[in-house]
Amino acid sequence: MELKEYLEAYRPASEIVSHESGRLGGFVHFYNEDFRAELFSYDVFIVGVPEGRRSVNNETCGLAPDKIRESLYDLYRGDWSSSILDLGNLRIGNDVDDTYVALKELVTFLVQKKKCLLVLGGGHDLITPIYRGHASYGNLLNFASLDAYLDFQDGDEHHSKSF
């Protein structure tokens, strides 16, 4: 898998990534096209998915990855030694289904290497490609989704409130 075909590097603004003692942002490494470190030496991978086209009444959730990073990287680091690589944002496809395929492939790629992936942004509709990425490798899935609302609606259409 050629990551650079799937990803847009995240370039943190200096005020976002705090190098203040103990802040998480000071310990995160950032992937870009010039990245030369051993990719799989990292334990945790972060990817943003700026996709909101099927998010009912919340199309702007596609802007969430970078907003979440602002708060996440300002948190204090815990007493653990896991290494973290921020892969940037997944390139969204011409069609939402293209984004789903790319996300599923990225998840499968990392799951095969037994890596932990934290997905930022997007709507609940992203649960399906994340699940399929795990299922295609035969893994059980531990999943947590943080949201302001519980979204349960009946219907056959696949969107963010049909879960």
Where would I find each of the regions flagged by the language model?
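Conserved alpha-helical scaffold segments that buttress catalytic/binding sites
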Residues: 2-46, 53-163
